[in-house]
Amino acid sequence: MNHMSDPTTVKVAVIGSGNIGTDLMIKVIRHSRVLEMGAMVGIDPDSDGLARARRLGVPTTSDGVEGLLALPGFADIEVIFDATSAKAHAANAALLQPLGKRLIDLTPAALGPFVVPAVNVDEHRDAPNVNMVTCGGQATIPIVAAVSRVAPVAYAEIVASIASKSAGPGTRANIDEFTETTAHAVETVGGARRGKAIIILNPAEPPLIMRDTVLCLATAPDPATRSAIRESIEEMVARVAGYVPGYRLKQQIQITEIPPDQPVHTLAADGGPAPTHQVSVFLEVEGAAHYLPSYAGNLDIMTSAALRYAESIAATVTAAPADQGATR
């Protein structure tokens, strides 16, 4: 349980009382020693997320961001998680950023820089608005980065397969933004010269655990380089599992030579060395079942990543003088 009304904690609000927002709220309450729930914000007064928040003693509003601004404790809230939709986040940011609130965006809006904690948690500590990419991005970009820090990656493709039951209306409304934002982050954070992202909502019953496939076309003609790629991936998997315990390799890492007649130039970005090998990584992400059952690893990796980043900036937020809020 977090420390209620502890002056050393940072008060946070969650906008969006759906699957992601509710899971995040539960994580803050149960597991964070430096964050304290200051508000849960929704637009549906009958939503399960708002009902749970009320039962847990968290201040709530069903009037969206306007309702948040009107809450008595709003001035004390330093960090705001946005778990709504890409379109809604743009409107929310326009209202909240001028007030000096730090925004952590869990939608694919990508108004601020991308943060994938295992790769670049320290790069954007002072950014007023950061974007957590997507669940598929949080699961796969660390792997692309693990390869690209050892060998050039001409092309990286990620496929995220999630249980249909775990995808709420916000996720479904953002499918196009999901693929665009994830592909962009595969390049900018993962280090691939060209990136592609695919999401699959699997309707199988019983629901299947989140599965992710990462394919990288890399320049690794030397056996020592290929060995270093394996070690780099294994180290990265362990790093992500440090904050997402259900994150693991589903199969052994596969590195295969690209046949000479394979037209990989149609995928690879122009310029740079020609790829010699395909690196295939198969992942499974089991959820912690804080809100939805354990098949919803996509919720877990997204909210765990956001929590990790928020906790990493908590000391910065508490150290900043209150009158500098608008310039932080």
Swiss-Prot record:
It is an enzyme of class 1 (oxidoreductase). It catalyses: acetaldehyde + NAD(+) + CoA = acetyl-CoA + NADH + H(+). It comes from the Bacteria. NAD(+) binds at residues 17-20, 166-174, 298. The active site is at 135 (acyl-thioester intermediate). Pfam families: AcetDehyd-dimer. GO terms for molecular function: acetaldehyde dehydrogenase (acetylating) activity; NAD binding. Keywords: Aromatic hydrocarbons catabolism, NAD, Oxidoreductase. GO terms for biological process: catabolic process. SUPFAM superfamilies: Glyceraldehyde-3-phosphate dehydrogenase-like, C-terminal domain, NAD(P)-binding Rossmann-fold domains. The keyword Mitochondrion does not apply. Its EC number is 1.2.1.10. Signal peptide: none annotated. InterPro entries: Acetaldehyde_dehydrogenase, Acetylaldehyde_DH_C, NAD(P)-bd_dom_sf, Semialdehyde_DH_NAD-bd. Belongs to the acetaldehyde dehydrogenase family. This is Acetaldehyde dehydrogenase 3. It comes from Nocardia farcinica (strain IFM 10152).
